[in-house]
């Protein structure tokens, strides 16, 4: 397994619309395993393939259990996802491994139902609510070249751009 480099905003790579996965082979399995290792090392709960430079419609989500630990066997590997149903509305404070250090409230569906494939190309259906529903929507957005900061109000977006410039200035002087 290998740690992969996470691509950061404002890289144009993050705006790529990912392509459907067609080969469910050992290479794909290795990519999923590397993505999981990278996500855990980066203290994230979700990671889309495009965030590590792979323009493929796949993502992983591994929510921590009540003890705060993310168990590998709980990791969802979601390939070629499609929304079947969505419902409700909620605000959730989101962050992103590609936009480190910035968190903001984003409006999301409260519940989602998706169809996807696992690493063995088996078709699955998943109903999710609350944090899992938010994470699924956030990661699927990545597959479509959309970041959570794109969903902010104009005022919050200006605040984000200002904070980003200040952070970049600070990093140049370190």
Swiss-Prot record:
The active site is at 139. Its cofactor is Fe(2+). Keywords: Hydrolase, Iron, Metal-binding, Protein biosynthesis. HAMAP family: Pep_deformylase. Removes the formyl group from the N-terminal Met of newly synthesized proteins. Requires at least a dipeptide for an efficient rate of reaction. N-terminal L-methionine is a prerequisite for activity but the enzyme has broad specificity at other positions. Its EC number is 3.5.1.88. It comes from Helicobacter pylori (strain ATCC 700392 / 26695) (Campylobacter pylori). This is Peptide deformylase. Binds 1 Fe(2+) ion. Transmembrane segments: none annotated. Coiled coil: none annotated. One of its GO terms (molecular function) is peptide deformylase activity. It comes from the Bacteria. CDD domains: Pep_deformylase. Belongs to the polypeptide deformylase family. Fe cation binds at residues 96, 138, 142.
